[in-house]
UniProtKB/Swiss-Prot annotation:
Keywords: ATP-binding, Cytoplasm, Glutamine amidotransferase, Hydrolase, Ligase, Nucleotide-binding, Purine biosynthesis
GO-annotated biological processes: 'de novo' IMP biosynthetic process
Species, as recorded: Methanosarcina acetivorans (strain ATCC 35395 / DSM 2834 / JCM 12185 / C2A)
Protein's cellular compartments: Cytoplasm
InterPro entries, per the entry: Class_I_gatase-like, PRibForGlyAmidine_synth_PurQ
HAMAP family tied to this protein: PurQ
Name assigned to this protein: Phosphoribosylformylglycinamidine synthase subunit PurQ
SUPFAM superfamilies assigned to the protein according to its UniProt record, in alphabetical order: Class I glutamine amidotransferase-like (SSF52317)
Amino acid sequence: MKIAIIQFGGTNCDMDVLHVLKDVVGVDAETVWYKEENLTGFDGVVVPGGFSYGDYLRAGAIAARTPIMDSVKKIAAEGKPVLGICNGFQVLTEARLLAGALTTNEYPKFRCHWTNLRVETADTPFTSKFRKGEVIRMPIAHMEGKFYAEESTLAELDENEQVVFRYVDEKGRVTDEANPNGSLENIAGILNASRNILGLMPHPERASESILGSDDGRKVFESMADYITENF
C-alpha cells in the first residue's frame, strides 16, 4: 500500500500528513509534486491543506488545473480513496470532484480553533473506525470554509448520506453558535456520489496524537488504510 500526498506551490500541511500516515498509522506514503502526471503504483491520494498559489482567483482554483489533477481524477475513477483536507477540499470542489463550493467565512476573518464534529455516517472508506452520531474534535484553520450549494444539491447530499461531518456543540447538537464559518446546514465534510472521495475543512492530521489535544483525526487515516487493504 502506498498513498500519494499532493504538493502544490503554497501547500503547508503535507509534512504533517506524511508524519501521521508513516509514523502514526504505519503505512507507506510519499509526497508528489504537482507537475507529475502519473500516479501509477499509488492506492490512494491525500490533497492536504495550505494556501495553494496564494489562494489567487479563488481558494484551490489554480491547483485544480495543474497536471497532477488529471491523475487524481483517474485514481478516483478507479474507486481508490481520495481525501481533501481544508485547501484540499477547496481544490476538489474546484476540480468538480465534489459538489458545492467553499466561500469566504460568513464573518470574513481567518478562523483557527478547535471544533466539535458529529459523524453523520460511518459507512465510508474514511469513517469506518467511527460510530454514527459520535462527537469528535478537530481544529480548523481557514478563511474560505463556508460550504455552499444549491438547495437541490443539499437535498441530494442529505438523501444519499453524503454529508459525513457537521459542526455541532459538545452535546452533538447542530447550532448556529457551533458553526464557525456559516456553512449551510453546518456541513464540515462531504462525499462524492461514489463515496470514495471525501473533502472536509477540519484538519484530522492535527488531531491524530493525544499530545495535540485529540487523536480523533487518526481514525480518518486508519479507516482509509483499512479500506485500501480490503479492496486493493
